[in-house]
Amino acid sequence: MSDINTARLPVFSLPVFFPFVSDDIQAVLTRGESLC
């Protein structure tokens, strides 16, 4: 169980503690879609 929790923690903590990173990823994704 600890391994699963450790693997899941970064997935849930990253968008919460680093929302600006998620915004950058969204911008890159939309930019990539527009380029394609």
Curated annotation (Swiss-Prot):
MF-aspect GO terms: toxin activity
Biotechnology: Amanexitides have a structure closely related to antamanide, a cyclic decapeptide with antidote activity against amatoxins and phallotoxins, and might therefore exhibit the same activity.
Propeptide segment residues: 1-10, 20-36
Signal peptide: none
Xref: InterPro entries: Amanitin/phalloidin (IPR027582)
Coiled coil feature spans: none
Keywords associated with the record: Toxin
Superkingdom per UniProt: Eukaryota
Tissues in which the UniProt entry reports expression: Expressed in basidiocarps.
Its job: Cyclic nonapeptide that belongs to the MSDIN-like toxin family responsible for a large number of food poisoning cases and deaths.
Name this polypeptide is given: Amanexitide proprotein 1
Species assigned in the record: Amanita exitialis
